Amino acid sequence: MMELPLCGRGLILSLIFLLLKLSAAEIPLSVQQVPTIVKQSYVQVAFPFDEYFQIECEAKGNPEPIFSWTKDDKPFDLSDPRIIAANNSGTFKIPNEGHISHFQGKYRCFASNRLGTAVSEEIEFIVPGVPKFPKEKIEPIDVEEGDSIVLPCNPPKGLPPLHIYWMNIELEHIEQDERVYMSQRGDLYFANVEENDSRNDYCCFAAFPKLRTIVQKMPMKLTVNSSNSIKQRKPKLLLPPAQMGSLSAKTVLKGDTLLLECFAEGLPTPHIQWSKPGSELPEGRATIEVHEKTLKIENISYQDRGNYRCTANNLLGKASHDFHVTVEEPPRWKKKPQSAVYSTGSSGILLCEAEGEPQPTIKWRLNGLPIEKHPFPGDFMFPREISFTNLLPNHTGVYQCEASNIHGTILANANIDVIDVIPLIKTKNEENYATVVGYSAFLHCEYFASPKATVVWEVADETHPLEGDRYHTHENGTLEIYRTTEEDAGSYSCWVDNAMGKAVITANLDIRNATKLRVSPKNPRIPKSHVLELYCESQCDSHLKHSLKLSWSKDGEAFEMNGTEDGRIVIDGAYLTISNITAEDQGVYSCSAQTSLDSTSEKTQVTVLGVPDPPGNLHLSERQNRSVRLSWEAGDDHNSKISEYIVEFEGNREEPGKWEELTRVQGEETDVVLSLAPYVRYQFRVTAVNEVGRSHASLPSDHHETPPAAPDKNPQNIRVQASQPKEMIIKWEPLKSMEQNGPGLEYKVSWKPQGAPEEWEEEIVTNHTLRVMTPTVYAPYDVKVQAINQLGSSPDPQPVTLYSGEDYPSTAPVIQRVDVMNSTLVKVTWSSIPKETVHGLLRGYQINWWKTKSLLDGRTHPKEVNILRFSGQRNSGMVPSLDPFSEFHLTVLAYNSKGAGPESEPYIFQTPEGVPEQPSFLKVIKVDKDTATLSWGLPKKLNGNLTGYLLQYQIINDTYELGELNEINVTTPSKSSWHLSNLNSTTKYKFYLRACTSRGCGKPISEEGATLGEGSKGIRKITEGVNVTQKIHPVEVLVPGAEHIVHLMTKNWGDNDSIFQDVIETRGREYAGLYDDISTQGWFIGLMCAIALLTLILLTICFVKRNRGGKYSVKEKEDLHPDPEVQSAKDETFGEYSDSDEKPLKGSLRSLNRNMQPTESADSLVEYGEGDQSIFNEDGSFIGAYTGAKEKGSVESNGSSTATFPLRA
C-alpha cells in the first residue's frame, strides 16, 4: 500500500466520514453480505456443579456462514466426540463428564462465507482445580513474651475471589487489633505476643465462593513463654518486608481498587499512619481500614499516581516505607472501526484507535489473516486507518482491528460490503398511521440502497413532492409532518430512487382530535381539616377512549391509583379526594391524560388555609398612668391574610385569671396604644384573626400596673322598685371592678321632691340599693347616685326622675252606653276616672261580662266571667264572640301598675237573633229511580227562633262538575225529612241543607246520593251496626225468612264504603233441623277457616291502602269560612280578653260559602250521624244511613261513593 501526504488526508477523511454516514445501514439478509458475529461467550468457568459448559458463537450473513474454532491459536475440531456441536451454529457444549481440564484454554470463533470471515473476541475457558492445602506436619512454635511472630497461611491457588479466615477448632475467629493483623496473603502477624496468645489450634481457612469450597490448613501450636524482663523496642516494618528497602513499586489498573498494607513489630505496639508526600489523599475515595494497617483507594485514576507513605510510631521511635504507585490500563477503544456499505467505484476509510497504558499496538487483519497478505492497488494503510479508493466488489470482506498491550487484547470486526442494488424498502406497504391535531406525524419509509438513494414524499395521486417548512424527510426515509391539522389526513407515497432503480410504498395517515383536560375547582383555597375533591374532566377522541388513562400527581410525584394514607387520599378515576386536609397537602396538583397517540396535563394550585400562628414577642413601651404601647410580631398567616388582632387583658381583682377583650387592631398593624383604667395590674395577650378563624392566644406580656384615682363615671340604669304605697326602693347598676379606679368604693344617694326648694337628702351606702319612704303616693322625685372612693368622687351626676309607690285606683268608671253592633258584637262606652283617683300611672281599662240567660228558652246561665283589657287612656271598646239571642251583664274598671280599682254598676243588655248553626246531620235514607228521601237533625245552636230550612240540590258527575242549583224552602220548623221527586234516574246528586231564623240561614251541611236505574229497588236504612274485633260475630235480631244485606266496613272510613257485602236470608225454625249438625262437619270447619283467613287478608290490604291517604281535620276546613257577622267588625280595635280563668273565649268564627269545592263534601263521621246514636259505641262505627254502596269488592281512596246498587228487602 502507498502512503498519502498529510495535507490531503484531512479532505479525504471528511469525504469518507460523509460517505460512511450516508452508507452505513443495516443490510437486509436478502442481500448478499459478509458474516457478522451477533453473539459470543467471553469468560466461561467450568464449575463442578454444572451439567455442561456452553461456549457460544452465533453469526449472520448471506450466504449463510460456516463456523470454525481455534484453541490457543491452534485449530480446534468441532467434530470431537467429547463435545456437542449445534447445527448451523458455532456454539458447542462441553459435558461435565470425567476430566475436562484439557479443554482449558483461549478460544476464537471464525464465521465465514465466500465474501469474508468474521472473528470473535478471545473466549477463555477456565477449568479450576480443587484447591487443597498440602498435607504437612507443622512444628510447634515457641516464642518469648513480647517477641513478634508471623504464622504463615500459604493458601492454595483457586478461582478468585479468595477469602481467608483465621479461626480455632471451635470455628471462633481470631480477633484482630493493632497488635494482631492478617495480611492480604493470609499470614497472621503479631507485633508482640502475650501469654494469652498461646493456643494449639491456630487454623487458616481459605474460602472460594464461586467453587462453593472452604479448605483448612493443619492447626498450628503457638506457645508464649513468660518473661521477667520484657524489653521495649522501636518499630520495625514486617510489611512490606525489610528486604524491599524503604521504597517499593506497585502497579494498579485504572478503575480498580488500590490496596496498600503496612505492619510493624515493636513494643509498645506501633501505630500506623498513612500520607501522600506533597499531596493529600484522594478525598471521598481513600479509606484507612483494619486498624490503620491498610490504605484503600477506590476507582483509581491517573491522578492517583505517585508515592504513598506508611509510618509506624511508638514511644521509642518510628519506621516508614514509601510505595511508588503506577497506574496502567488495558486497551480500550477510542475509535472503533465501523461497518459500512459502499457502491462500486466509491471511496472509504476505516479508523481504529485504542488507548491504554502502555500504549496499545494496532494490527489489521482481513478475514482473520494479516492484511499484508491481501494488498489492493491504490489503497493506503496507516497505523490507525485504512483508506480505500475506487472500491471494487473484491474489497468486500471482514476487517479486524486488534489492539494489544501487556494487560490484554481487544478485537473489533468491521464489515466492508461493496454492493450495487436497487432500493429495497423495508417498511410495509399501506401502513396505517395516526396522530392528533397539533402533534407531529411520522410516516416511515425505511430502506436499503447502494449506491446512495434519494427519498421523495408525495401526496398520493399527486405528482409534486411535499414542500414547506412543516414537512421534513429524515435520513432514514421517515417523513415528519409538524403541527398537523385535520387537512393532513390522507394517503402519502414514498419514492426511493438511486442509479440502479426506484421503489415506492403508500402510507395512510388519520388525524384524531387532541385530548383536553379541565381540572375543577381551579386553584382552590381550602381550610385545614376540610375535604378537598378535585375533578378532572376529559374530552377525548372516540377512537382513543379505549386507551385513555388518567393519573394524578402532586408537585411532580405521582399518586398510587388505589389511594394512600389509609384511605385519606382516594383516587377514583377522574376524582381525587383528600379528607382531613393538612398543610402538607398544599401544592400543585396535576391531572394527566395518556392515550395511545397523545398526552396532556392540567394543573391546579391547592392552597391550604389555616388559622394564624399566635403573635410573638409581645413588648410594652411608652408606659403612662392611663396608657401603654403594646407591640408584637405577626405569626405565620397560613395563606389567609390576617384581618385583625384582638388585644385582651387580665387584671380584674375580683376575677383573677379572666381575660377580657380590650380592643381590636387592623391586620396590617403590629402595635397599638392602649387606654387603661387606674388601679389595675394589667397583663396583655394578642390573638390573630383571619378568614379561617382565630389563632391561639399569644404568651402573656409583662405586667403593667396603673396608680389609683377617683372614679371617672357614675352608676347607670338608676330605677325604682316599690311594693308598698309611698315606698321608693332605689336601685342601680354597680360599677365594675375595672371602673372603681381605687380602693374603698361607696355610693352617695341624693333625693328630693321634684320642683321643691328643699335641700337634698343624702345617704352613703356600700351596696347598690336603698329604701326610702315618702309622704305621698306616686310623687315624682329627683334622684342622683354618685360613686366615691378613697381618692375622691366621680363627676356630679345628672338627676333622674323616679316616682314613689302606687296605690289601687279609688273610683270606678261610669258606663254611658252599650251599642249592639250585631248578634255577637257590642261596643261599650264609659267615662274616664279622675286623675287624682288613679293613685299611680293609669295602665288602662278592663271590661268584665257574663251571660245570664238565653232568650230562646228563658233558662238562666251560670255566671262565667269573661275579661277583656284595653291599654292606655281610652273610653270605649268592642266585645266580640257573644252568643246571639241572649242576655248579658257588663262592668268596667280602671287599673294601674298596682292593680285594678272598683267595678262600675252592672250594665244589662241583650243580643238579637242570629243565624243558626248547620243541621246536626243530613242523610239520604231512601232513593228510587227518580225520588229520594232526606232526613236531618236540628242544629246544636239555633241562635234564635227557627223559621224553617233551605234545601238545595244539584247534579254532579264523576269529575265533580256541578249542575244547576235547585232550591226548596221548608217553612215548617219542626219538619225533619223531605221527599224529593222528579229526579233523573241513575244520576248522582249533591244535597245542601241550611237552618234559618228571621236573621237568615246558617251554614249548610251537604250529602251526596245517586238515584237508581230501571227495575232497581230502593236502599233501606241500616238498622244496626256493631263494632267487632273478632272474625265471627253472631247477630240474633234478624227476622226469620227475610233477606238482609250485610256490610263489612273499617271504622275509620268517612264515606261509608264497604269492603265486603253479601245478601243473606234468615231461616225459620222449621229449617233448623236440616243444619243442626253441620257445624260439626270437617269440611264446614275447613271452609270457615279459609273464609276467615281470606277476610283477614282483605282487611290488612284495605287498612294499608286507606292509611296511605293521610288524615285531615274537619275543623280546619270549617275555620276557612268565618262568620260574616263577625267579619264586618274587624275594623274595630279589640282588646286582650279572657274568662275568669284567663282562658280563651269559647266558640269559633264561621261563614257560609255557597261555592264550596266538591272535595268539601267528605266531612267527618259525626256529620253523618242521625239523631239516635245509642246503637253505636264511642268509636262512631257504623254511623248513620247509607246513600249507596260500592260495587262488590271495590275500594276507592278519594273519600266519596259514586256507584250504588239496590238492597233486597
From Swiss-Prot:
Its main location: membrane. Residues 1-25 form the signal peptide. CDD domains: FN3, Ig4_L1-NrCAM_like, IgI_2_L1-CAM_like. Pfam families: Bravo_FIGEY (PF13882), fn3 (PF00041), I-set (PF07679), Ig_2 (PF13895), Ig_3 (PF13927). The chain crosses the membrane at residues 1084-1104. Residues 696-717, 1115-1170 are annotated as: Disordered. It is found in: Cell membrane. Residues 1105-1209 are cytoplasmic. Keywords: Cell adhesion, Cell membrane, Developmental protein, Differentiation, Disulfide bond, Extracellular matrix, Glycoprotein, Immunoglobulin domain, Membrane, Neurogenesis, Phosphoprotein, Repeat, Secreted, Signal, Transmembrane, Transmembrane helix. One of its GO terms (molecular function) is protease binding. Changing Y1186A: Inhibition of migration potentiation. Glycans are attached at N87, N225, N299, N476, N562, N580, N767, N822, N945, N1027. SMART domains: FN3, IG, IGc2. Residues 26-1083 are extracellular. It is a single-pass type I membrane protein. Disulfide bonds join C57-C109, C153-C204, C262-C310, C352-C401, C445-C494, C536-C591. One of its GO terms (biological process) is axon regeneration. Gene3D superfamilies: Immunoglobulins. The modification Phosphoserine is found at S1148, S1161, S1181. A motif (DGEA) lies at residues 555-558. Residues 35-124, 128-223, 235-328, 331-417, 423-510, 515-607 form the Ig-like C2-type domain. Belongs to the immunoglobulin superfamily. L1/neurofascin/NgCAM family. The FIG[AQ]Y motif seems to be an ankyrin recruitment region. The DGEA motif seems to be a recognition site for integrin. Extracellular matrix and cell adhesion protein that plays a role in nervous system development and in synaptic plasticity. Both soluble and membranous forms promote neurite outgrowth of cerebellar and hippocampal neurons and suppress neuronal cell death. Plays a role in neuronal positioning of pyramidal neurons as well as in regulation of both the number of interneurons and the efficacy of GABAergic synapses. May play a role in regulating cell migration in nerve regeneration and cortical development. Potentiates integrin-dependent cell migration towards extracellular matrix proteins. This is Neural cell adhesion molecule L1-like protein. It comes from Mus musculus (Mouse).
